Amino acid sequence: MAADEDIIKDGNYDPHVQTDKDKVDYAPKGVDTTEYRYYPDNPESTLNKYRFAMKDHSQYYDPCQESAKMSFKCLELNDYDRDQCKEYFDAYRECKKQWLEARRKDRTNWS
């Protein structure tokens, strides 16, 4: 149990994220297409709010870290050609935008 708590504290594990590619439903039926996200992170989740509140003041926390990792992986695979990875950068930017808007709307839950 302590190992699981350390993983969650470090921000490397989200129990709601499906990591098995065979179980991911890329086009779920009945989902409103206006609310579709092009990034795997959920910056407004309760877990991210908790992690952000529990971090030290001098510590940096990025709720869009999965999108950031994907951007770096794309750069590595494409010989650091930024044009090839534009979609990944856009996805990260949208994730950060959603997170900052959520923090501005509800400052009490994002201490």
Swiss-Prot record:
User: Got a GO cellular component term for this one?
Assistant: mitochondrial intermembrane space
Q: What is its main location?
A: mitochondrion
Provide the CHCH domain boundaries: 61-103
- Give the residue range of the signal peptide: none
GO biological process terms, alphabetically, are:
mitochondrial cytochrome c oxidase assembly
Q: Which gene encodes it?
A: COX23
Q: Which InterPro entries match?
A: CHCH, COX23, Cys_alpha_HP_mot_SF
Residue ranges of the motif Cx9C motif 1: 64-74
Protein name as catalogued: Cytochrome c oxidase-assembly factor COX23, mitochondrial
Spell out the disulfide connections. C64-C95, C74-C85
* Family, similarity comment: Belongs to the COX23 family.
Q: Which UniProt keywords apply?
A: Disulfide bond, Mitochondrion, Transit peptide
Localization, UniProt: Mitochondrion intermembrane space
Q: Where is this region: Disordered?
A: 1-26
Gene3D superfamilies the UniProt entry points to? CytochromE C oxidase copper chaperone
Its biological purpose is as follows:
Required for the assembly of cytochrome c oxidase.
Matches recorded under SUPFAM superfamilies:
Cysteine alpha-hairpin motif (SSF47072)
Locus of motif Cx9C motif 2: 85-95
